């Protein structure tokens, strides 16, 4: 499937069950998200809508209606006011090329609209795909939190990468 066979658009209420299922599959497999507990629709809404100030929430949808991935850009209390935190999730096993790039292009448009200085992405060090994705998008590592404990007791580094939205 090519970029012409999917569209990126803002998330709507009807998307929530499908996005929750997509995220739960990623959580179930493990190793690519800091989230470790599957979500109910209620906890999905709490996490992505009720507990943060959203700037952008985009979904990639195949021409047949399948949800291929989503990207959230939100304010974060641990970041400067003119920064936002990004999270990206793609359907497991999807062979669709260009979803991540298309999502980021739309998210970046919103970041510029809100005059953000930078975007932060925090990725588990064992998430090679996530690290490579943010590198491809132009993010640069600026901080490493070492040996962050998981629920299992296993420890993993978390890498923070930044993307400058506006230039000096």
Enumerate the predicted regions with their spans.
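Conserved acetyl-CoA-binding loop-helix of GNAT-fold acetyltransferases
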Residues: 96-111, 132-136
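Helix-loop element at the rim of GNAT/NAT acetyltransferase active sites that forms part
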Residues: 21-38
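A short beta-loop-alpha structural element at the N-terminal edge
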Residues: 7-19
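Acetyl-CoA-dependent GNAT
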Residues: 10-13, 36-93, 104-106, 110, ...
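Terminal substrate-recognition subdomain of acyl/acetyltransferases
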Residues: 2, 89, 152-168
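Conserved catalytic-core motifs of GNAT/GCN5-like acyltransferases
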Residues: 118-124, 135, 140-157
């Amino acid at each position: 499937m090519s970029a012409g066979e999917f569209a990126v658009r803002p998330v709507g209420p009807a998307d929530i069950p499908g996005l929750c299922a997509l995220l739960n599959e990623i959580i179930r497999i493990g190793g690519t998200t800091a989230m470790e507990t599957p979500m109910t629709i209620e906890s999905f809404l709490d996490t992505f809508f009720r507990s943060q100030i959203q700037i952008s929430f985009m979904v990639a949808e195949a021409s047949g209606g399948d949800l291929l991935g989503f990207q959230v850009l939100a304010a974060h209390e641990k970041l400067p006011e003119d920064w936002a935190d990004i999270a990206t999730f793609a359907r497991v096993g999807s062979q669709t090329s260009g979803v991540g790039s298309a999502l980021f292009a739309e998210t970046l448009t919103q970041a510029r609209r809100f005059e953000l200085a930078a975007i932060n992405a925090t990725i588990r060090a064992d998430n090679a795909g996530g690290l490579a994705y943010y590198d491809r998008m132009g993010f640069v590592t600026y901080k490493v939190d070492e040996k962050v404990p998981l629920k299992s007791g296993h420890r993993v580094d978390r890498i923070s990468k930044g993307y400058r939205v506006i230039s000096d």
